[in-house]
Regions:
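Short glycine/proline- and charge-enriched loop/turn segments
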Residues: 95, 169-177, 276-285
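Conserved SAM-binding strand-loop segment of SAM-dependent methyltransferases
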Residues: 56-63
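Predominantly a Rossmann-like dinucleotide-binding segment in NAD(P)-dependent oxidoreductases
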Residues: 124, 131-214, 336
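Beta-strand-loop-alpha-helix segment that lines the small-molecule cofactor/substrate pocket
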Residues: 2-6, 74-132, 147
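N-terminal Rossmann-like dinucleotide-binding module
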Residues: 2-54
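C-terminal helix-rich "cap/oligomerization" subdomain common to oxidoreductases
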Residues: 1-9, 14, 34, 74-77, ...
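Contiguous beta-strand/loop segments that form the cofactor/metal-binding neighborhood of enzyme cores
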Residues: 189-265, 296-312, 344-345
Length: 345
């Protein structure tokens, strides 16, 4: 079967009965275009409570039972990153639309295989880079695009998330190929790419002190060359001892934006109409509507694109490009020299 037929109501399957899986289920249930048709998890003890709570028509422990189900229209993959390639390819070849959680995959080569199958089948593949639907970050992008802070000079974001005790079911996060900069740091990288464009070069440092029993560095900092002579920085730590944050700052020639995905306001510094420098010391606090994980907005955009026959809001190439930057960053921290970033074709 080639392509995805547009319709007004979509039978959805959520693969992965985890905390994030539940967020996606709740997001689907809030959408009038979605029907929670099926759920799947390889662990029966994780599947049963979801089956009892949400009562889907189908509940299975093997995703392959859903691949050729004629009643299924689209799947949301909330599974370990190592499974993204295998599952995405299977569902795309069966003519199902796919919303795959971030990161798209753990290597650029895997991403390119997914892109190739999407193109070959005429399928629909969206990557769940949820920061693009976060109200504060959406507003920051709008303010920057409108020229509110002038021309960008420097951008920075951080992903500080204590992974102590967060090894994942069957330790799926604790594998050598899942570096924290790829698995979690892709959020911050994707945000800066979305706002400042594709960086061309990266240099970075990393250490391994916070989670010594994990197989990869747990703290890293990277500096990027962005288009238009904009510089950027991303800090990632999965071994930190603090509450979660994605604090991000955007510096421009006329002002500065400070925001994150947990605060109830965005902070804006800007020059007033008279050009007064005093305005820099008096920030404007712009109220922000918080949305937990923003999966509701993400799913809404996914289904709207399917219904209207439009391109995916976060395309496979976009998802792969973020992975490309993350992979190059890990390489830079290991080699000790700047790395030129290779993007997907």
């Amino acid at each position: 079967m080639e392509g995805v037929m547009a319709k007004n109501k979509w039978n959805i399957a959520v693969i992965g009965c985890s905390g994030m899986g539940k967020q996606h289920i709740l997001g689907a249930l809030k959408n009038e275009k979605a029907v929670l048709y099926a759920i799947c998890d390889s662990a029966p003890e994780r599947l049963k409570p979801f089956k009892d709570e949400f009562a889907p028509e189908v509940a299975v422990t093997d995703y392959r039972e859903l691949v050729n189900d004629p009643k299924l229209d689209a799947v949301i993959l909330v599974v370990p990153d190592q499974l993204h390639l295998e599952m995405s390819v299977a569902f795309l070849r069966a003519g199902k639309a796919v919303l795959c959680e971030k990161p798209m995959a753990l290597s650029l080569e895997e991403c390119e295989k997914m892109i190739a199958v999407e193109r070959e089948t005429g399928g629909k593949l969206m990557i769940g880079q949820v920061c693009r639907f976060t109200p504060a970050f959406v507003m920051a992008k709008e303010l920057i695009s409108s020229g509110r802070i002038g021309e960008l000079t420097f951008v920075e974001s951080e992903y500080a998330h204590n992974y102590t005790g967060a090894r994942g079911y069957n330790d799926w996060r604790v594998v050598p190929e899942r570096h924290g900069f790829i698995g979690g740091g892709c959020h911050a990288v994707d945000l800066l790419r979305w706002i400042a464009g594709d960086p061309t070069e990266v240099f970075g440092y990393a250490n391994h002190k916070g989670l010594p029993d994990w197989p990869t560095d747990d703290t890293a900092i990277a500096v990027y060359k962005f288009p238009n002579d904009v510089m950027g920085k991303v800090f990632v730590s999965i071994g930190c001892r603090r509450n979660y944050t994605m604090r991000s700052v955007f510096y421009g020639t006329k002002g500065t934006i400070i925001c994150d995905n947990k605060s109830e306001h965005l902070t804006l510094f800007e020059t007033d109409e008279s050009g007064s420098h005093s305005s820099y010391t008096v920030p404007k606090l712009i109220p922000i509507k918080l949305a937990d994980h923003n999966t509701t907005g993400e799913i809404e955009m996914f289904l709207d694109a399917l219904t209207e026959g439009k391109p995916m809001p976060v395309s496979s190439v976009e998802g792969a490009s973020t992975v490309a930057v993350c992979v190059a960053t890990v390489e830079a921290t290991k080699s000790g020299v700047p790395v030129q970033i290779r993007y997907p074709v």
